[in-house]
Structure formats: C-alpha cells, structure tokens
C-alpha cells in the first residue's frame, strides 16, 4: 500500500479549497492509499481555513500561520510535519491534477521527483499569458545555467519526496518566498539525492497569485544569497 502525505499551502483559497480537498480525497480513497493531507493556511484573510475545517475529514491536518509568511515557509512547515513514506507538495488550485502522482510513484528508486511542464510528454491544457511564459522561461534559463543544471522546470508546484530526503532538505531551507523550489533542488543535489523530472499535465488559472516580474526579481536575488549561504552545505 502506498503511504503518502500531501502538503497544500493555501492563501485566500476560500473559493476552491473545498473542491480541491474533495477531489484529492476521492482520488486517494479510490486508490486505497494510506494517506494524510496537511493544509497550511498562510495567514489568509478570507474563510479558507474555516471552510477546510468544516469539511470534517479525519485525515486532514491543519497548520496556521497567523500572518502571511510566504509559500516557502508554509511548504516547509507542512513537509517537516508530514509522517508518511512519500511526501508531495501540491498547489491549492490543482493546476497539476492529483492523478499525475501515479507517474511519479512508479519510480521507487528516486528520492526527489519534480513535476515538469517543460519536458517532452508534458501537456499544457491552458497556457499562461505570453508575458508570464517568457518571464518563466527566462528565470528557468538562469536557474538552469547557474544553480541546478539539467532540471528544465524548477517552479511547477508538484514535487514528490521520499520522507528521509524531505526531512533533511527542508530542515535547512532558508528561502521562504516563491524561490524556495530552486533552493530545495539545489540542496537535494548538494546532499547527493537522486532527482528525476517527470512530465505532467498542467493548466494555468487566471487568478494565480504569482506576480512574475516582482517575484522574478526576488527569486534572482534569493539565488545570489542562496549560493553564498549553501556553498559548503553537503551531507557529512
């Protein structure tokens, strides 16, 4: 039986959190997984947490940030709390359908499996606006050249970890905003974990909270600090 934790960072997701959780639970129950879902509310100012709790699903756990601390902070809290053999973090909008986890779980010898929108075999059902796509490609190009070569898409919010890898990597994560994905992949490389990139299905949502230009510059700044901070980070 597959043992799986799913971490969902959520900020002002009251319009879809219930449907997201119902979709995930229906899938996991149908597959008869041993599972837990961890919702990390990142200081939402709407009814996200209230709605999620009112569903009263026994296998959902909740963490609450009293103020908005960033996606990276929220994912880190959830990953360090997770208890199952495999740990997935997924965006609250399910831009990558939960069923895509089946592809990743087929590679049992991999420590970190990265959902990718850029690989051959990926399928983009709804594209981002062109300025977002080009901005994302530019960021990915720089990241590919400077930090994590051979990973084509670092920013897709659908990544699977073995528990042991997740605990070691996220315990030393320092970037708390949207650039955290790059840091955890860099750390995975530094620690010598086996990384695989898997093509997935993905759809853009018009109300995405990613601000490509402002957050793009922040990611680049975070990269500079990260390289200096983790230069000597490796498994002892």
What are these regions (language model features)?
Residues 65-81, 86, 98-178, 204-214, ...:
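Acceptor/aglycone-binding surface of glycosyltransferases and processive sugar-polymer synthases
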Residues 3-5, 36, 183:
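Cell-envelope/extracellular polymer assembly enzymes that use nucleotide-activated donors
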Residues 13-16, 44, 71, 97:
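Donor nucleotide-sugar binding loop of glycosyltransferases
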Residues 180-187:
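Short active-site alpha-helical segment characteristic of glycosyltransferases
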Residues 41-49, 94:
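A conserved acidic beta->alpha catalytic loop
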Residues 13-28:
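Short, well-formed alpha-helical segments that are part of the catalytic scaffolds
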Residues 35-38, 49-81:
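Conserved donor nucleotide-binding strand/loop of the catalytic core
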């Amino acid at each position: 039986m597959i043992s799986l934790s799913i971490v969902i960072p959520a900020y002002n997701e009251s319009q879809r959190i219930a449907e997201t959780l119902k979709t995930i639970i229906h899938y996991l129950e149908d597959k008869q997984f041993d599972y837990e879902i961890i919702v990390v509310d990142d200081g939402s100012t709407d009814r996200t947490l209230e709605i999620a709790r009112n569903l009263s699903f026994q296998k959902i756990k909740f963490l609450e940030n009293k103020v908005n601390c960033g996606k990276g902070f929220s994912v880190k809290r959830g990953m360090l709390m997770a208890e199952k053999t495999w740990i997935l973090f997924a965006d609250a909008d399910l831009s990558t359908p939960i069923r895509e986890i089946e592809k990743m779980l087929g590679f049992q010898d991999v420590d970190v499996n990265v959902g990718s929108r850029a690989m051959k075999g990926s399928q983009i059902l709804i594209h981002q606006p062109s300025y977002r796509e080009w901005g994302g490609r530019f960021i990915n190009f720089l990241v590919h050249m400077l930090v994590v070569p051979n990973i084509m898409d670092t920013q897709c919010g659908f990544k699977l970890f073995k528990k042991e890898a997740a605990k070691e990597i996220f315990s030393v994560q320092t970037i708390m905003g949207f650039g955290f994905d790059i840091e955890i992949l860099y750390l995975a490389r530094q620690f010598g974990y086996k990384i695989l990139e898997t093509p997935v299905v993905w759809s853009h949502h018009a109300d995405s909270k990613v601000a490509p230009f402002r957050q793009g510059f922040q990611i680049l700044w975070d990269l500079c600090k990260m390289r200096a901070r983790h230069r000597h980070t490796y498994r002892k």
